[in-house]
Each structure stands twice: as structure tokens, then as C-alpha cells.
């Protein structure tokens, strides 16, 4: 696929974007309205899978597009270098690169058009978050950028709102065009949440979007892409499937977002990311967002971002939010059940509280959910063996508070952003300290406080040193029992008994099929009867 033909243009023409293979026609309901329906497709089998080769780009022949929309507010212009440095220091913000825009301090200073500003103010946000104060001017200026900030810091709106401005400045989609904005995310849950934000703030501009992810039927996703969408939020694997089978293309993408880039690389998506990005014109605007700054993310930045500017809120060192109270209990496997119940009783003293419990395996997820439900706790499980419909239902029940306790594995919980989670309980510790920080970051978001309880066993001894370091940085109280593991991790020869074996939770393993039940989605542990020993 090459774009060396000077006749290429947006809409119309033999080699145009939206050209002959779709046979004319159009679609309605989007920006500019009524264009009728899609015409017939051109030759060839639509379902044939085609290997994605890297195009030979000729920048001079590509249609021009606008990407700099930033008009600095007079109040921002008037700020001195000393004022800017003081603001960044106050917000623990560091910037790297050349010609970096000054941060803004209010929504009015951001320079958004009225139709965007109206949507923001209707949501009742008091002021921009730290990452938004610097990220919005960067994104609106059309620069390639890297944003590094902890989860729950407002990163989604940092790229979502500028994308709406970007879309409205581009020519309308023609039949056969792919999206203008592409957002890559590591998990289906995060992709769905990004879509919700895009829908919320893009509705007034009639900007259409779709969410393309695995584990769900392709039919609706294909229909959305065929009708035409300005924004596509996708997980890498499913998007490549859509590209290879000709269900969409990336020829119109001029605004690319890599969200939770570190997580995507952790999950092994680097080859897919590179294959996808190679399909997009190189003069696009690229925005990379990450919670950490490992060397793998740095390499991706060097390869795909052009003269980027970077904002980091907080330390590049791995750290937990200081709004989270971390409680670590050194226990045996046999003690976990009783300790869990005690903390649930504390957590649910607040009737509005939500509690997220992490388990290491899908089996443990189901077993503890069965146990809790039998004891009268309204718990539901979410993990990779649950079908997408059930996962969506569980998440909805948890968000609305109908089932305020959710038991999850790491993979299933990645990208989940639920407001009001007051307690996170690590029933099983994760395998590394990065996942620990990511887990407990589900609470204490956007300035609110939260509590994270972790059950630490002798089997987790390798995490002892890193865990103590994270707790010290956040000014947390480290129990003496845990400090012994800290010394051991730094070479102490002190030995401690292993404690009483693995033990664990026993209960029904059967996953079963879907049952009718409430909402028609429950399977296995989620369909276990709820005991009457609790106030629920």
C-alpha cells in the first residue's frame, strides 16, 4: 500500500480516501448529516485476510491536515517563567523538550471552543487536574507528546477533549474512510471506559465512535466501522484482525493515542502496536500516556514520536498515591479467610462503600466468591473465563453498588476505573511490585482517600524489600513482621518458619453455563445463592 499518487484526496476519485472499493454511497447521522447508506463493495472477497505490509509513505502527496489549535490565553501569556516554574513545582510536575507550552490553571484558560467548554462545565468538574493543566496545551498545540502520571489522574480527558477539537477541524469522512482518531488500550474494560468518555463529550458535535476489542462478537463492531466513525478505541489484537480482513483502514488517522503504554507492553502487545502504527501516516500527531517510564516505553517513543515534549506528574520512581492508607498483614494462607471477613465488616460499615478484592487465579476468584455469597456477602467475580456479557454485567452491578464487592484477577481488572472504591484487598499478593501499585491505585483516586489491605505470606518474601520501599515513600506504617522480610531481601541470613502451608479457600469450582437469573448473565460463582447471614 503506497500513497505516491498525487491524485489522492479526501473523498471521491479513483485513488481517494473512501475510493472505489466501496462503490460509492455514504452514511448518515454523523457530522454534516444525511448522506444515505453505503453502496456496494468493489471486487474481491471482503473476508479475505491480507498481510499488513508497511506502506511506502510519500508525505508530499498526502492530503494536508491541521493539528495546531492552541491559542494561548492572555492570562497564561502574562505569566512569568518564575510563575510557571512555581506552578509546576507546586504540582510536582516536570517537563522535558523544546518550546513547551505554559500550563493553564482553569478550564477557561485551556482555549477549548465553546462547545467543548460547555460539556466540561456541565460535568461539574471544579478545576483541571495537574496532568490536564499541562497536557491540554501540549495536545492542542499539535505536538507529539508523552504524559506520565498515576492512574486516576485525569489522563483520559487529557487526550479526549483535544481529539474532539482535532476531529472538527478535519474534512468529513467519506464512504470507506477509517477513523480520524485511534486510541489503543490494553484491555477491553479500559477501552469501554474510554468510549464512555468520548461519547459523553463528543455528543454535541455528533462525533461517532466505536469500541473494538476481543472477547465479544465482531458483528456490531464491523457494522460500526462500516457506517463510519471518527473515533475508534481498540485493543491491539482485535484491531489487527479488523485491518487484515479489510473491515477498516487507518488511512485517515491523524491523531493517535497509546493509552497505558506500559501495560500494553507488559502484556506483550509490542509487535501488534508496531504493526498498527506502521499503517498510519508518519506526520500524524501521536500522544503516549503511561503510568511508568520503563526502557521499553522509551524505545517506543524514540521510534514513533517526532520531537516529543513530555510532562511527568509525580516521580518517575514507582510510587503509590499518598491518599491511600496501606495496611499489610503478615499471615498464613489459613488465616486469610477470617482476616478478609474482618476487613469486609469494617469496609461495609459505610453503606456506600465499594470493595475490590484481588485474587491470583481464576479458580481462587470463583472459590472466594462462592464462599462470600454463601456467607451473605453480595460478591461477584470477574476474570478471563467469564464471557464478555457477564463481565459487563458484573462491572455494572459493581459500579451501581448493587453488588458492592467484586473479586477479580489482575488481567480482568486492568483498566477498570470505578468511582467510589474505598477498599482494595489483596487476598493474594501480586507477582511484582508494579502490579501492587497498580492494584491499590484503584482506590484513593482524584484526590479522594482509600484503604488498601494486603495479606502477605512467606511465599511473598521476594516482594518484601520493594513493598517496604513503596510504603516508606508514602509515609506508611510498616509492621515489624514485614520489616523482617525487608532485611531478608537485602541479604540477611535470619530464617523464619514458613507458617502453615497453602490452605486456601475451598468451594464450588464449576463454572457452569449462563443462567437466566437477574440480568441473564450469571455463571458459576456469580450464580451461587446469597446467604442470609448478612444485612444484604
Curated annotation (Swiss-Prot):
GO terms for biological process: nuclear polyadenylation-dependent mRNA catabolic process; nuclear-transcribed mRNA catabolic process, nonsense-mediated decay; rRNA processing; termination of RNA polymerase II transcription. Residues 497-522 have a biased composition (Gly residues). The gene is DBP2. Residues 496-536 are annotated as: Disordered. One of its GO terms (cellular component) is cytoplasm. Residues 136-311 form the Helicase ATP-binding domain. GO terms for molecular function: ATP binding; ATP hydrolysis activity; G-quadruplex DNA binding; G-quadruplex RNA binding; mRNA binding; RNA helicase activity; snoRNA binding. It catalyses: ATP + H2O = ADP + phosphate + H(+). This is ATP-dependent RNA helicase DBP2. CDD domains: DEADc_DDX5_DDX17, SF2_C_DEAD. ATP binds at residues 149-156. Belongs to the DEAD box helicase family. DDX5/DBP2 subfamily. Keywords: ATP-binding, Cytoplasm, Helicase, Hydrolase, Nonsense-mediated mRNA decay, Nucleotide-binding, Nucleus, Ribosome biogenesis, RNA-binding, rRNA processing. A motif (Q motif) lies at residues 105-133. The keyword rRNA processing applies. It is an enzyme of class 3 (hydrolase). The Q motif is unique to and characteristic of the DEAD box family of RNA helicases and controls ATP binding and hydrolysis. A motif (DEAD box) lies at residues 259-262. ATP-dependent RNA helicase involved nonsense-mediated mRNA decay and ribosome biogenesis through rRNA processing. SMART domains: DEXDc, HELICc. Residues 326-486 form the Helicase C-terminal domain.
